[in-house]
Amino acid sequence: MTNESQPVSPINKLTEAKTIISFVVAVFVLYMLFSSIEFDTIVGVITQARISYILLATVIFFSTLPIRGERWRLLLKNIGVKAGLRDASEIFMLSWFANSIIPAKMGDVYRGYLARKTWGVPISKSFGTVYVERIYDVLTLVILMGVSSILVFGTNSPSEIRIAIALGFSIVVILISIIIAFSKGKMFVSNRLPIKVRQIFINFTEGLQESVKKGSISLIVFYTILIWIMETARLYLVVESLSPIHNMGISLSLIIFVALAASLLSAFPATPGGLGAVEFAIVGVFVLVGVDPGVSAGIAILDRAISYWGLMMVGGIVYVLSKKK
């Protein structure tokens, strides 16, 4: 958690050691992943993609932005912040961009900083809404991953898949446990903290508690499911852009599983935007079920051209033009 009065800039963090190291790690992972596959094969796959499908996948990806903005606006409303959809969506895009260039979801902290700058809400309190948002995302991801893995693998899921799902459920349990522990023991913990961080902790805890209001849960769940349906649709269109040429026969349930597994990795990344880890997951799962490595690599590159490099480009433009940064 950042100091409440400290300015936050994702661009300034680009030169920090942890950011540079995270990009080095990402490049190394990408090199290890793609170096074993013939470069000409990957290029051949990519150039055969139907551009209309890729463009539609791109439109769907960026169409999730106002939905994500509206979901966050509802969470902000729960803590007493009257935010407009346009402002919430713009700030979400700026934090999304920040997450693509700096590691460890620091863009979420940047979102809290922009919320304070725009609406006067403490960073730590608005960060509580981001934390709750993350729980909605991960819980939905893990449930849908579990269902899709059964459809793909039946009861004989590979150990790697079972571990991934178990890890996801563990993360959900930990996140929810923290909310319960902080809510039940707010005063007990805060009274034992240094005065400098006591109010930050109290604000964060209040943000957690107030974000979870029964009246908005059903709508937030609906938006969350809709977001992940659209994320899956993006990957489906990328796969379909190659399908007539390579006759892959990839089932919808497998596409759902891969899209969600990749999203889970990007939810808590050690590298900016999960760079390296997400590509590894996409290629790894497709190869695991018998898809050609070159085709799998092509799918990963095309999909990440939208969800990572496309986001970085569009987000960068928004960042340059935005008056909120």
Predicted regions, residues:
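Helix-loop junctions and terminal segments of transmembrane helices
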Residues: 73-76, 109-114, 280, 318
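Predominantly cytoplasmic-facing regulatory/coupling regions of multi-pass membrane proteins
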Residues: 1-93, 151, 157-267, 306-325
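Membrane-interface alpha-helices at helix entry/exit sites of multi-pass transporters
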Residues: 85-90, 107-109, 121-134, 292-302
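Interfacial segments of multi-pass membrane proteins
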Residues: 115-122, 280-298
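Membrane-embedded alpha-helical segments of transport systems
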Residues: 94, 98-102, 127-150, 301-313
